[in-house]
């Protein structure tokens, strides 16, 4: 068996992509539906089925409350941080634990990590089908501006999906890696502008002799293509209410129709100046059914979304400033993510950087390609490439007066480790509470709490005397580990930051087992579907043969075939694999017997045999060519066939 591959997965808000290194080059893998991108959508049906990807998307309008999309916008977040997202989804978002998030469906409650894991399992299966071998290792990408909790939650999703996450890397960095993979001898400074379905990132990198060094990163994890869709949706709802007096925002299935229509309109407006939005039978009142029929121009779309486009400007300017560069210093601007196709977005990029953006990369696939390259580096398949990423946000602890004291500044190259000595704030203090923070604000309360832990057993001493060394360690995944040590006694307390909105180890293990069980169930379901499809094909073929055979087969055989076709169709409806396989065997035998008879009737010499040959009489049959005492015997025309000359 060949060496195990490390696949690269772009786990996107809207779509996901999987890639792998083959023969020294990255290959984007098609899924079972023949597409290179897979919708990041999971649905639970009334029959108990779990649908992933395009199949889930296809039934979303009729099953809106059980179809989970854009789960990435909730991953690693607390419920009070998801208010804007919750307003615009068709499914129910509820509290998980103290502060976390879950999705409520007819099949049960699921965390964003579990939903993301289902998508990752689809990516894993896609890679395994392509490679013909089991896959257990992956590099998964995240938005550069994801905080520690979001990174940890993404890694947990990978574990639930049965993957060892070898590395979490930032999406813009992965894109730069893909862009510069064949340009190792080029020294340049590039900006990667990444506007995806749910997040926005801007990263400034320097490429030199195969070294990809991130100089700075910035972004907005509440901004993406979904927000552009929402702007169109809100306009449609408002316009329809003005026209009819009816509010169509309450019905979940209607909202799903509006969402899909808005997304379609957004895509069309990237290539045309106006688009027609037509949704028949959108609702009804006492006067009858109502239809939504509107024209949206690009000018109106630009007006509706101007504030969203403008929100990307300041992060770009901040990233340039943090990198110590001017816009004129940037050699190339790489566009990543589906939303960069919006003309107003491209125009803003041109204004900010003073140059036309580079459109040479596929914005939908480039991130997964970069992840595959990093997987190749970790697997030893790729050499002469070094990736130096950064932490997007500053890290520190709360100190006296509620101030945040930073230990690691944002845009510090990772992995990194830094220590600082603190002391007690009161006499005879026997314990210190370490409040770990992430953010850029001066006051602790204005930043994000990553976790808290206590160092106890400090010997009594006047305040300021004990020496407490706090160490922050950020690994290559951007995940934080913190320790506190009393230098006087040597006592130490270490933690890996686990957020209140995250998952415990027990919860992760339970979800891993659930996912494995679902994988087995999904495999069994797939086998049933394949068997049903095969039986359906056999049934159709037999029915066609019987209809075309005419009088070449007898009435008894026709009835036998008709009865078997009926039993086969009942088996198809049963979803019972054993019954389906039995029906396949029966119908195959009948089909073979009938086909043989039809063939023998149609074969050269069959007509001669039926007429009794040149010197004989026709055999008794329903045609009446021969009757009692040989009456009505007719001469048959025939041709002598010499088999030796055939």
From Swiss-Prot:
<dbReference type="InterPro" id="IPR012725">
    <property type="entry name" value="Chaperone_DnaK"/>
</dbReference>
<keyword id="KW-0597">Phosphoprotein</keyword>
<dbReference type="GO" id="GO:0051085">
    <property type="term" value="P:chaperone cofactor-dependent protein refolding"/>
</dbReference>
<feature type="compositionally biased region" description="Low complexity">
    <location>
        <begin position="600"/>
        <end position="621"/>
    </location>
</feature>
<keyword id="KW-0547">Nucleotide-binding</keyword>
<keyword id="KW-0143">Chaperone</keyword>
<feature type="region of interest" description="Disordered">
    <location>
        <begin position="598"/>
        <end position="646"/>
    </location>
</feature>
<dbReference type="GO" id="GO:0031072">
    <property type="term" value="F:heat shock protein binding"/>
</dbReference>
<dbReference type="InterPro" id="IPR029047">
    <property type="entry name" value="HSP70_peptide-bd_sf"/>
</dbReference>
<feature type="modified residue" description="Phosphothreonine; by autocatalysis">
    <location>
        <position position="199"/>
    </location>
</feature>
<dbReference type="GO" id="GO:0140662">
    <property type="term" value="F:ATP-dependent protein folding chaperone"/>
</dbReference>
<dbReference type="Pfam" id="PF00012">
    <property type="entry name" value="HSP70"/>
</dbReference>
<dbReference type="InterPro" id="IPR013126">
    <property type="entry name" value="Hsp_70_fam"/>
</dbReference>
<dbReference type="GO" id="GO:0042026">
    <property type="term" value="P:protein refolding"/>
</dbReference>
<dbReference type="InterPro" id="IPR029048">
    <property type="entry name" value="HSP70_C_sf"/>
</dbReference>
<keyword id="KW-0346">Stress response</keyword>
<dbReference type="GO" id="GO:0051082">
    <property type="term" value="F:unfolded protein binding"/>
</dbReference>
<comment type="similarity">
    <text>Belongs to the heat shock protein 70 family.</text>
</comment>
<dbReference type="InterPro" id="IPR018181">
    <property type="entry name" value="Heat_shock_70_CS"/>
</dbReference>
<dbReference type="GO" id="GO:0005524">
    <property type="term" value="F:ATP binding"/>
</dbReference>
<dbReference type="GO" id="GO:0044183">
    <property type="term" value="F:protein folding chaperone"/>
</dbReference>
<comment type="function">
    <text>Acts as a chaperone.</text>
</comment>
<protein>
    <recommendedName>
        <fullName>Chaperone protein DnaK</fullName>
    </recommendedName>
</protein>
<dbReference type="InterPro" id="IPR043129">
    <property type="entry name" value="ATPase_NBD"/>
</dbReference>
<dbReference type="GO" id="GO:0016887">
    <property type="term" value="F:ATP hydrolysis activity"/>
</dbReference>
<keyword id="KW-0067">ATP-binding</keyword>
């Amino acid at each position: 068996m060949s060496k195990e591959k490390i696949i690269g997965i772009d786990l996107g808000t809207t779509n996901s992509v999987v890639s792998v290194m083959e023969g020294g080059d990255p290959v984007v893998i098609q899924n079972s539906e023949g597409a290179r991108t897979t919708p990041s959508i999971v649905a639970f049906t009334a029959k108990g089925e779990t649908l992933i990807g395009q199949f889930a998307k296809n039934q979303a309008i009729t099953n809106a409350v059980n179809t989970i999309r854009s789960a990435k916008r909730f991953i690693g977040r607390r419920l009070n941080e998801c208010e804007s997202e919750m307003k615009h989804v068709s499914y129910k978002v509820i509290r998980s634990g103290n502060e976390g998030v879950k999705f409520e469906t007819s099949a049960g409650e699921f965390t964003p990590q579990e939903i993301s894991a289902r998508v990752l399992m689809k990516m894993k299966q896609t890679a395994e089908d392509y490679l013909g071998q089991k896959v257990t290792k992956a590099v998964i990408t995240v938005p550069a501006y994801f905080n520690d909790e979001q990174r940890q939650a993404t890694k947990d999703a990978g574990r639930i999906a049965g993957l060892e996450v070898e590395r979490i890397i930032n999406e813009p960095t992965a894109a730069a890696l893909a862009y510069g993979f064949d340009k190792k001898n080029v020294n340049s400074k590039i900006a990667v502008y990444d506007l995806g379905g749910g997040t926005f990132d801007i990263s400034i990198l320097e490429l030199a002799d195969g070294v990809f060094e991130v100089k700075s990163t910035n972004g907005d994890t509440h901004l993406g293509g979904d927000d552009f869709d929402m702007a169109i949706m809100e306009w449609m709802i408002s316009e329809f209410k003005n026209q009819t007096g009816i509010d169509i925002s309450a019905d979940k299935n209607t909202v799903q129709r509006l969402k899909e229509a808005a997304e379609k309109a957004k895509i069309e407006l990237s290539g045309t100046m106006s688009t027609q939005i037509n949704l028949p039978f959108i609702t009804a009142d006492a006067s009858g059914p109502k239809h939504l029929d509107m024209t949206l121009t690009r000018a109106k779309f630009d007006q509706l979304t101007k504030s969203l486009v403008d929100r990307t400007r300041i992060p770009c300017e901040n990233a340039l400033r943090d990198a110590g560069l001017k816009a004129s210093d940037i050699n190339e601007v790489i566009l990543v993510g589906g939303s960069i196709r919006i003309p107003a977005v491209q125009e803003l990029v041109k204004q900010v950087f003073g140059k036309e953006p580079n459109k040479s990369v596929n914005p939908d696939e480039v991130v997964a390609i970069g992840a595959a390259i990093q997987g190749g580096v970790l697997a030893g398949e790729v050499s002469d490439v070094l990736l130096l990423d950064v932490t997007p946000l500053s890290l520190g602890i709360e100190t006296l007066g509620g101030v945040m004291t930073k230990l690691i500044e944002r845009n510090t190259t990772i992995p990194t480790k830094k220590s600082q000595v603190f002391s007690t704030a009161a006499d005879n203090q026997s314990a210190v509470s370490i409040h770990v923070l992430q953010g850029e604000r001066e006051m602790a309360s204005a930043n994000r709490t990553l976790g808290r832990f206590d160092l106890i057993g400090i010997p009594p001493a006047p305040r300021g005397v004990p020496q407490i060394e706090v160490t922050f360690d950020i690994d290559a995944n951007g995940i934080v580990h913190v320790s506190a040590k009393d230098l006087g006694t040597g006592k130490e307390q270490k933690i890996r930051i686990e957020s209140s909105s995250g998952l415990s180890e027990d919860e992760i293990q339970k979800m891993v087992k659930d996912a494995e069980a679902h994988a087995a169930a999904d495999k069994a379901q797939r086998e049933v579907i394949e068997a049903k499809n095969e039986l359906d094909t056999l049934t159709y073929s037999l029915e066609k043969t019987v209809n075309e055979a005419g009088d070449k087969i007898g009435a008894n055989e026709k009835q036998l075939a008709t009865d078997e076709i009926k039993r086969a169709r009942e088996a198809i409806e049963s979803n019972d694999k054993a019954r389906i396989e039995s029906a396949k065997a029966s119908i195959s035998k009948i089909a073979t017997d009938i086909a043989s008879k039809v063939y023998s009737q149609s074969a050269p010499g069959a007509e001669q045999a039926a007429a009794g040959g040149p010197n004989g009489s026709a055999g008794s049959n329903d045609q009446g060519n021969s009757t009692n005492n040989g009456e009505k015997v007719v001469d048959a025309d025939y041709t002598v066939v010499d088999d030796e000359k055939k």
